[in-house]
Curated annotation (Swiss-Prot):
<dbReference type="GO" id="GO:0005758">
    <property type="term" value="C:mitochondrial intermembrane space"/>
</dbReference>
<feature type="disulfide bond" description="Redox-active">
    <location>
        <begin position="282"/>
        <end position="284"/>
    </location>
</feature>
<keyword id="KW-0811">Translocation</keyword>
<dbReference type="GO" id="GO:0015035">
    <property type="term" value="F:protein-disulfide reductase activity"/>
</dbReference>
<dbReference type="InterPro" id="IPR012891">
    <property type="entry name" value="GCK_dom"/>
</dbReference>
<keyword id="KW-0496">Mitochondrion</keyword>
<feature type="region of interest" description="Disordered">
    <location>
        <begin position="341"/>
        <end position="365"/>
    </location>
</feature>
<feature type="domain" description="CHCH">
    <location>
        <begin position="290"/>
        <end position="334"/>
    </location>
</feature>
<feature type="region of interest" description="Disordered">
    <location>
        <begin position="142"/>
        <end position="276"/>
    </location>
</feature>
<protein>
    <recommendedName>
        <fullName>Mitochondrial intermembrane space import and assembly protein 40</fullName>
    </recommendedName>
</protein>
<feature type="compositionally biased region" description="Low complexity">
    <location>
        <begin position="356"/>
        <end position="365"/>
    </location>
</feature>
<feature type="compositionally biased region" description="Basic and acidic residues">
    <location>
        <begin position="205"/>
        <end position="224"/>
    </location>
</feature>
<keyword id="KW-1133">Transmembrane helix</keyword>
<dbReference type="GO" id="GO:0045041">
    <property type="term" value="P:protein import into mitochondrial intermembrane space"/>
</dbReference>
<keyword id="KW-0809">Transit peptide</keyword>
<dbReference type="GO" id="GO:0005743">
    <property type="term" value="C:mitochondrial inner membrane"/>
</dbReference>
<feature type="disulfide bond">
    <location>
        <begin position="303"/>
        <end position="316"/>
    </location>
</feature>
Length: 406
């Protein structure tokens, strides 16, 4: 700064000297004295001003003072709230804290409640359940000396925070909680466990633990006596019954009725001879009672079941033919039944060509052969599983046929 001022002073002095010399050598048209006075005054003031600045004197234009550094904020001691003046609080845009509104100070590492060894031992004894003891916390701060617990019963003015005197030990220990959880798990396992009942009825346990009779009664047949009928065999049996005529259907039903007489060999059927009712929801029917031809199927099946004619079901031929005609109207739905009927008819036709019966009885022969081809597997199954039926007239035909084949 001093060097710049010195250079400016020299320039002004040289310029003033030039002007004085110029005006002295070339005076204007007026008087010389009149023109030299302003030049001399200008040169003189310029020189004085340069010298004034060069000497480090204060300038006429004052500079703005540099901003002073803010003093570091003092952190209040533990247990003391920071006092904020009203102007500073108004100027501060930050929200007012809860402590400024009068709330109790939050426990921090600097302002936390500590306990003496005696108090700690009393607390441990209380939690273990040996003896109840009142806990008197002692607050220790930076600026205040630690006070001893009032053993003599003296009251203190400072508010006591932390654990109250009503603190109690937990009701269950770690081992007790494990035991309680084990009891709950065992109870749930007992509820979900499937209970076994007598062979008269099969009962299952629901998720709620309540027992109820199942809709479908399971087979109660021991594996040593006979094999259980699978669902596929039952479906094939019903399709065979629906595709055949009344005579062989009566034979199959009679064999089934004989099997039902034995409790140990009891099979799953839609008809219950004890109650005389037909369970149309039985899985053995394959849902045919609710198809497009459900009414025709119910009519033919119930007629066969309740038939008292000899042979059984001979009076239901028309209803079975009506059911078969209905099947042909819905080939997509009853494709398997129609296929079984056609195969049975084809086999019966081959047998008829080889036979020597008169032409007058050809029609009846074809019907009988068709029925035999459809219901023969069903009757064989019942006869094999129930040897006591071999002496019945309905099963005699099947036995003779097997002997002839052998």
């Amino acid at each position: 700064m001093f060097r710049v001022s010195l250079q400016a002073t020299r320039r002004v002095a040289f310029r003033s000297a030039r002007q004085i010399r110029f005006y002295s050598a070339h005076p204007p048209s007026g008087g010389v004295s009149h023109m030299n006075k302003p030049a001399l005054l200008l040169a003189g003031f310029s020189t004085l001003g340069a010298i004034y600045v060069a000497d480090g004197c204060p300038t006429l234009i004052e500079r703005k003072p540099a901003p002073a550094e803010k003093p570091a904020e003092e952190t209040p001691a533990a247990g003391q709230s920071q006092s904020i003046s009203e102007p500073t609080k108004d100027a501060d845009e930050s929200p007012v804290s809860a402590q400024e509104e009068g709330a109790e100070p939050v426990t921090t590492p600097e302002n936390e409640i500590t306990y003496s060894e005696e108090t700690h031992q009393a607390l441990a004894a209380t939690l273990s359940g040996d003896e109840p003891a009142a806990i008197e916390p002692v607050a220790e701060s930076v600026n205040e000396q630690a006070t001893e617990p009032a053993a003599s019963g003296e009251a203190t003015n400072e508010p006591v925070t932390g654990i109250s005197e009503d603190t109690k030990a937990p009701s269950l220990s770690f081992d007790d909680s494990k035991t309680a959880k084990g009891v709950v798990l065992e109870d749930e396992a007992d509820k979900k466990e499937i209970q076994q009942t007598s062979p008269d009825a099969v009962k299952t346990a629901s998720k709620d633990g309540s027992e109820g009779e199942s809709d479908v009664v399971l087979h109660e047949k021991s594996p040593a006596e006979a094999e259980t009928i699978t669902e596929a065999e039952e479906q094939a049996e019903i399709r065979s019954i629906s595709g055949g005529t009344a005579e062989q259907s009566a034979t199959a039903a009679a064999a089934a009725a004989g099997v039902q007489g034995e409790k140990k060999n009891e099979q799953q059927t839609a008809y219950n001879p004890e109650t005389g009712e037909i369970n149309w929801d039985c899985p053995c029917l394959g849902g045919m009672a609710y198809g497009p031809c459900g009414e025709e199927f119910k009519s033919a099946f119930s007629c066969f079941v309740y038939s008292e004619a000899d042979p059984k079901g001979i009076n239901c031929v028309e209803k079975f033919s009506t059911m078969q005609n209905c099947f042909r109207k819905y080939p997509d739905y009853y494709a398997e039944q129609i296929k079984d009927e056609e195969e049975a008819s084809a086999e019966a036709s081959k047998i008829e060509d080889k036979s020597t019966t008169p032409v007058s009885t050809a029609t009846s022969t074809v019907e009988v052969q068709t029925e035999n081809a459809v219901f023969e597997p069903v009757l064989e199954k019942y006869v094999e599983e129930n040897p006591q039926l071999k002496d019945t007239p309905e099963a005699a035909a099947v036995t003779n046929t097997d002997d002839e084949k052998k």
